[in-house]
């Protein structure tokens, strides 16, 4: 009905409600005869159909009908309920109802409205049959359209038009006080009915399509027809809520359907059969999902909303594959579906026999039985001899064109395929079955069941039927076997590899169909899972070497190496490299670690390849058994004294591995990451790193990726989501394996534990049981580490954050007090507080933590230990590895002297026997030269000291450049005068004989500290020393050399410290040491900051 006619009827019907006579009567005296009046009612009972309105309106204008008004109301109500949702029928109904309303106004319309509204009340009893439910929904859809049309033309307006309130349906009586628009109340009642089943979604979509102006604010064409001014807004709000619920339900059903498909697929592969419970549930969910999906698309397009993704697999399962830019590129052999074009045509292009089949079935005539029997025998003879594509295709056509198709022939064909023993003809027989599969489905189904049962009997018995396996493989290539049946066979063969012949069956099956399954897109994903299962099974310790070799051959069969890869030369490993690989990764727990250290020290360290292998072995702890990580650390600690730079490189690489693990955050690398943090912990336990390095690593693990390096429960860190507890496992692995707690570690441990506790609370609660146990064990281990103060755990996030804040404030207060005492607050903070309190506190006052934690400062240690005598040399921190080796030093020296005669500089920590018989005059010259070299080594003449002297010279040149011209000239002049005085002193003493008694002695001793280079050992002064003993000048040992001919003799002179010569030497040595330390700090700071 067009808008003009609607407005015309609306005007007439509104005037009728106001009591005006608007219906045109043919005559003033109406026909009151029974025949005429009952005839009108009979016409009404026929229903409102196209063409009936003119006859009914004519009778309505001529017949009296007053006495039959109640019967007319009942008849019209029944007719309205049965109006079909057709445009012409609805228009006819609107015209007739409008005419009746204009003729009788409220007397007719008021009871009609009450009776018609009963049709929209939802049934109180559930309708069991879905068919009946759909019929009811279709009827309600037509009734709603008729009601809306009558509402727009002004016939039905509001509940106030109903005179008897008892006639109002129950669902409207509850809401009479709310004064909602009548059409809105009806729609709300209809759309809420069994929403989860989606029956009413079709009503919603049909309504918005038919009455679109009711939902558009920019369309005012029907504003004059709407009785309630709030109707538009109410309908828009109602449908907005309905759309949100529809989208959510459609997405939920989409995930359920996909999940059900995946579970069914897994169940099929596991059992090899269709499961009725999955099929029934799927068949039940699919129609509901289709209803919601269709409704969501329609509503989304109408209201211009973003429609959720409901096609194909769920978003979580989508895997995008990059398509190649070159469409005609030649794939490598292992990625080709078929070996060549002829093979592709054989399996993919089947002959079209549809016309032959239709002719055979439509014009089949009775033939002579003898002739028919001859034809059948000839057909089977030719079938037995068929060996190529053309012949088998011709036989497919002959079968139908010769009218051979009947039940007996089909059974004979099935028996023929079961009994044939010629393996070479199985591909053409499979092609025959594939060509006729559409017309003989029962033969295909029976033959597949035969192959399936035969296959099942082989899986668990000591039998093998190669013919059936090959036939099964050929049927796979023609895609006649269901995918679940294929992968059930493969999976079962892999899982029960110990059953005799299963590996042979799997080899035959994959030899004939493996590449097809691997490269066919429909099977590729499942086949890759099967290949991974084979690779995992290959690592099963229960399998013998023959089984593992067979599985390796299957993988090679599926992924054959290219000719290019076969020609590539394999990297060869030297026997020495192979020896150290086996020693560290296989035999680490079989030998004493001291022996392993000796073997590693004897490696050819000058060979770069050997160094690379050893570096890889000591920097990849995940490649050894987890229980052997402490042993690996022991060996590394044993090397520290001899290969310090190498050990530092290994530790740096472990720290880099931990950093890399945080950046990549790959689930598959979790065990690697655990191994690395355990290795770092053991390195700390063996005193090769300071506690600051370990603490910084723990903080870095916790804070990595968080905003401002601070974990916050209100901001999502994608690399560390709230439901990922792996970082907690890393931290607890470190803390639970710490075996020593130096003072510097204990000092900062409380803040670390409090911060770690806060971090655990920002995770989703409750924690998993295993994680909770590890956290509890960690806090229990450290609860008594702080002396009398016991660490108390918090109950929740708020309490933990409060305690952490209080601890930070107290530490900041102590830090500020110390800075004021030192007078350096301004230089450290620049008048501001640190932006990150935890960082500022954990990194605060490094100078105060220069103590070695009873361990080793790898970067800032003094060089004194390096240039100490060989007899007293030991690794910094005196770790266990060095102590265990001390008893074997003498035995080692003989071997090492033989190995290292040509390279003394590489002997970083080796010790030799020292000859104590210095005054033996009968020694030859070689022995004396050896003694001299040992003496030089004892007093610092090693490479490290030379390097320090060179660094001192470079630093002096650097300072010299900073001075102006006048200062440099003054220093040069002073140096020349000093050299001149020294030369004069030497010339004057050439002929002078030195007598100890003539050495001048100063009355008061000069208090000068003795340098480490010149003193061997010094016992602490006793508290019982007398004043005279304390006042005596201390003496320094000097070696006095005399040469007589070729023989050189030496003797020790004890010179007092108050002699000017001695004091000058002491001051020079002290100055040299101080400058050396300054240079070292500058260089190290520049290198490692």
Curated annotation (Swiss-Prot):
Q: What is this protein called?
A: Nonsense-mediated mRNA decay protein 2
**Sequence intervals crossing the membrane:** none
Q: Report the gene name.
A: NMD2
Spell out the note in the miscellaneous section.
Answer: Present with 1280 molecules/cell in log phase SD medium.
Domain of life, per UniProt, equals Eukaryota
What function does this protein fulfil?
Involved in nonsense-mediated decay of mRNAs containing premature stop codons. It interacts, via its C-terminus, with NAM7/UPF1. Could be involved in determining the efficiency of translational termination or reinitiation or factors involved in the initial assembly of an initiation- and termination-competent mRNP.
What are the record's GO terms for cellular component?
cytoplasm; exon-exon junction complex
Has the keyword Cytoplasm been applied to this entry?
A: yes
- Give positions of region: Disordered: 819-951
Q: Which Pfam families match?
A: MIF4G, Upf2
What molecular functions are annotated in GO for this chain? RNA binding
């Amino acid at each position: 009905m067009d808008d003009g006619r609607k407005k015309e009827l609306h005007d007439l019907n509104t005037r009728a409600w106001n009591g005006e006579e608007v219906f045109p009567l043919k005559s003033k005296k109406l026909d009151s005869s029974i025949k005429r009046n009952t005839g009108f009612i009979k016409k009404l009972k026929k229903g409102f159909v196209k063409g009936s309105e003119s006859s009914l309106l004519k009778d309505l204008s001529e017949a009296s009908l007053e006495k039959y008004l109640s019967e007319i109301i009942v008849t019209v109500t029944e007719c309205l309920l049965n109006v079909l949702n057709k445009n012409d029928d609805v228009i006819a109904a609107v015209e007739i109802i409008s005419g009746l309303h204009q003729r009788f106004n409220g007397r007719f319309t008021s009871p009609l409205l009450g009776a018609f509204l009963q049709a929209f009340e939802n049934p109180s009893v559930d309708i069991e049959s879905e068919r009946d439910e759909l019929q009811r929904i279709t009827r309600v859809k037509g009734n709603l359209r008729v009601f809306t049309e009558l509402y727009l033309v002004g016939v039905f307006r509001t509940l106030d038009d109903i005179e008897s309130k008892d006639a109002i349906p129950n669902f409207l009586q509850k809401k009479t006080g709310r004064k909602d628009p009548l059409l809105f109340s009806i729609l709300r009642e209809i759309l809420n009915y069994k929403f989860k089943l989606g029956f009413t979604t079709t009503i919603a979509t049909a309504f918005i399509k038919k009455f679109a102006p009711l939902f558009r604010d920019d369309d005012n064409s029907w504003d004059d027809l709407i009785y309630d001014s709030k109707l538009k807004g109410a309908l828009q709000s109602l449908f907005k809520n309905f759309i949100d619920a529809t989208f959510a339900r459609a997405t939920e059903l989409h995930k359920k359907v996909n999940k059900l498909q995946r579970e069914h697929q897994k169940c099929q592969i596991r059992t090899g059969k269709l499961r009725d419970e999955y099929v029934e549930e799927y068949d039940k969910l699919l129609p509901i999902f289709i209803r919601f999906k269709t409704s969501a698309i329609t509503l989304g397009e109408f209201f211009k909303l973003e429609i959720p993704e409901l096609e194909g697999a769920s978003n979580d399962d989508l895997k995008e594959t990059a398509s190649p830019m070159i469409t005609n590129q030649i794939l490598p052999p292992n990625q080709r579906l078929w070996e060549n074009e002829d093979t592709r045509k054989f399996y993919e292009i089947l002959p079209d026999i549809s016309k032959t089949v239709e002719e055979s079935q439509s014009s089949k005539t009775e033939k002579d039985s003898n002739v028919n029997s001859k034809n059948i025998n000839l057909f089977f003879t030719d079938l037995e001899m068929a060996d190529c594509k053309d012949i088998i295709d011709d036989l497919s056509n002959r079968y139908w064109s010769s009218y051979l198709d009947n039940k007996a022939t089909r059974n004979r064909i099935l028996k023929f395929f079961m009994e044939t023993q010629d393996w070479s003809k199985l591909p053409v027989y499979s092609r025959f079955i594939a060509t006729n599969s559409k017309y003989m489905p029962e033969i295909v189904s029976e033959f597949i069941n035969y192959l399936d049962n035969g296959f099942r009997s082989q899986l668990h018995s000591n039998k093998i039927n190669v013919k059936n396996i090959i036939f099964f493989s050929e049927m796979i290539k023609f895609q006649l076997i269901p995918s679940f049946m294929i992968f059930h066979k493969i999976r079962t063969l892999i899982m029960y590899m110990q059953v005799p012949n299963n590996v042979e069956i799997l080899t035959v099956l994959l030899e004939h169909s493996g590449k097809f399954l691997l490269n066919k897109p429909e099977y590729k994903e499942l086949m890759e899972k099967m290949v991974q299962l084979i690779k995992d099974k290959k690592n099963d310790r229960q399998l013998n070497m023959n089984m593992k070799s067979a599985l390796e051959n299957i993988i090679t069969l599926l992924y054959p190496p290219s000719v290019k890869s076969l020609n590539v030369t394999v990297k060869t490993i030297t026997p020495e490299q192979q020896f150290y690989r086996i020693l560290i990764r296989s035999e680490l727990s079989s030998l004493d670690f001291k022996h392993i250290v000796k073997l590693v020290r004897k490696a050819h360290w000058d060979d770069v390849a050997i160094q690379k292998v050893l570096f890889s072995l000591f920097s990849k702890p995940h490649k050894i058994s987890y229980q052997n990580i402490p042993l690996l650390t022991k060996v590394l600690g044993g090397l520290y004294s001899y290969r310090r730079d190498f050990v530092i490189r290994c530790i740096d690489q472990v720290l880099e591995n931990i950093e890399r693990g945080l950046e990549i955050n790959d689930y598959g690398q979790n065990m690697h990451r655990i191994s690395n943090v355990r290795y770092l912990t053991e390195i700390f336990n063996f005193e090769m790193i300071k506690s600051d390095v370990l603490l910084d690593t723990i903080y870095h693990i916790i804070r990595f990726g968080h905003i401002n390096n601070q974990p916050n429960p209100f901001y999502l860190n994608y690399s560390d989501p709230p439901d990922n507890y792996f970082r907690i496992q890393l931290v607890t692995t470190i803390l639970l394996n710490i075996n020593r707690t130096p003072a510097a570690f204990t000092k900062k441990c409380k803040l670390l534990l409090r911060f770690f506790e806060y971090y655990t609370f920002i995770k989703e609660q409750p924690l998993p049981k295993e994680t909770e146990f590890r956290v509890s064990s960690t806090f229990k281990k450290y609860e008594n580490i702080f002396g009398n103060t016991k660490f108390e755990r918090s109950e929740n996030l708020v309490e933990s954050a409060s305690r952490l804040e209080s601890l930070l404030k107290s530490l900041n207060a102590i830090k500020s007090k110390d800075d004021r005492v030192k007078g350096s607050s301004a230089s450290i903070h620049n008048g501001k507080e640190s932006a990150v309190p935890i960082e500022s506190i954990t990194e605060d006052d490094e100078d105060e933590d220069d103590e070695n934690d009873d361990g080793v400062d790898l970067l800032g240690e003094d060089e004194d230990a390096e240039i100490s005598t060989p007899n007293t040399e030991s690794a910094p921190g005196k770790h266990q590895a060095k102590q265990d080796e001390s008893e074997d030093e003498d035995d080692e020296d003989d071997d090492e002297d033989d190995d290292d005669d040509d390279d003394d500089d590489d002997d970083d920590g080796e010790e030799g026997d020292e000859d104590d018989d210095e005054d033996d005059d009968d020694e030859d010259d070689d022995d004396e030269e050896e003694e001299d070299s040992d003496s030089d080594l004892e007093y610092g003449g090693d490479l490290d000291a030379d390097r320090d002297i060179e660094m001192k010279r470079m630093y002096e040149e650097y300072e010299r450049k900073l001075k102006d011209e006048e200062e440099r000239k003054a220093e040069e002049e002073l140096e020349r005068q000093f050299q001149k005085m020294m030369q004069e002193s030497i010339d004057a003493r050439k002929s002078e004989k030195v007598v100890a008694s003539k050495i001048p002695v100063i009355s008061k001793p000069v208090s000068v500290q003795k340098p480490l280079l010149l003193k061997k050992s010094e016992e602490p002064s006793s508290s019982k020393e007398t004043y005279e003993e304390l006042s005596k000048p201390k003496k320094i040992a000097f070696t006095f050399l005399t040469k007589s001919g070729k023989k050189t003799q030496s003797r020790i002179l004890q010179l007092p410290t108050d002699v000017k010569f001695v004091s000058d030497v002491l001051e020079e040595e002290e100055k040299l040491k101080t400058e050396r330390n300054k240079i070292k700090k500058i260089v190290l700071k520049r290198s490692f900051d």
